Amino acid sequence: MISGFATPKGTETFKQNSSVNSLNFNDFENLHLSNVGIGTYLGEPDTRTDELVKNAVKQSVLSGVNVIDTAINYRAQKAERSVGKAISELIEDGKISRDQIFVSSKNGYVTNDADIQEDFMQYVMRELGKPGIVKEGDITSGYHCMTTSFLSDQLDRSLKNLDLECLDLMYLHNSIEGQIKDVSKEQFLENLKSVFELYEQKRDEGKIKFYGMATWECFRVMNDNSQFLLLEDIVEMAKNVGGENHGFKFIQLPYNMNYDQALLGKNQLIQNKPVSILESAVTLGIGVFTSVPFMQGRLLSPGVMPDFNDLKPSLRALQFIRSSPGVLAPLVGQKLSEHVSENLEIMNIPPMSNEDFLQLVKKLTS
């Protein structure tokens, strides 16, 4: 397995060695992270897609992207394995070292293994039920599980799939979204604290550097929604568990020119003052990665997005997201080489200044 993790020196070397505009890196937790990342969500669980994802990750890294995002349930574990192969080949070829890239994955959804031809429930019973990793009642109706025994097992599987000794960031995946139909909010928060305790332990063991929450609804909806979470409360929980140097430093949420709640919705509170989730994250020192930049292609249709900056739709979408104050990087799902090339043209131009971005938002919302 590949040892190491992203470091300030390694990521700075990556930034210096890349041919992209130097403004296209954000400094967070002393790491230099590209302001576009590659995501690996979609695709068939077959060998052709394995090759496409592996090559897309390699092409992205060689084009100046050092943020790579995946999840154990993406393509039933094959996404993680494709990422792992890409990283191994890049390191073997001397193109990068482990300390130059930031790799995140997600655990929480129960998944099978696409490389094993077996019925889903048979696999779950054999791999998780019989060994006692999960017991009756642990898995919700949404095929989600956040017991510490399950998440500990899944982290080890993710590390094995990725061929990494240490993961830079492990997200708890859609936790309240996957749990709230079956457990009370109070019970959920108790369980979340146990997960944070587990992840602090895994930091001590050297298996992860940071942990976070990859979400869909909870940080975008209003506080009367059962899925709503106040980021200030979650950070306070992390401090209670891990002290001031706790590892809860990142969230992920959907954000684009259609899903604009992260920017415009004042659903969060900081010292009782209404703020957006992006404003809250900045104040609390939480890094934000964003998903679905193109709404899985729907935003790229002619006439869907407003015109600005004379950029093609895909670049316009990325420019808007990565220029938003508080966003570290949109995560772009891309497999075909021509899509990678087109999307990463954005790395040749700097993000918008805060002033220009705020003027654009004013224009678009007036």
Q: Which ranges hold each PLM region?
A:
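N-terminal binding-site loop/beta-alpha segment at the start of enzyme catalytic domains
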Residues: 1-126, 133, 165, 183-186, ...
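Beta/alpha (TIM)-barrel catalytic core signal, keyed to glycine-rich beta->alpha loops juxtaposed to Asp/Glu
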Residues: 2-24, 149, 156, 173-366
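Residues at the N-termini of beta-strands
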Residues: 35, 67, 166-169, 210, ...
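Active-site mouth loops of central-metabolism enzymes
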Residues: 39-52, 136-152, 181-186, 304-311
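Well-ordered alpha-helical segments embedded in enzymatic catalytic cores
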Residues: 52-56, 154-157, 317
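Short helix-coil transition/hinge motifs at the ends and kinks of transmembrane helices
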Residues: 93-94, 139, 269, 287
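Active-site gating/metal-coordination segments in enzymes
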Residues: 113-171, 177
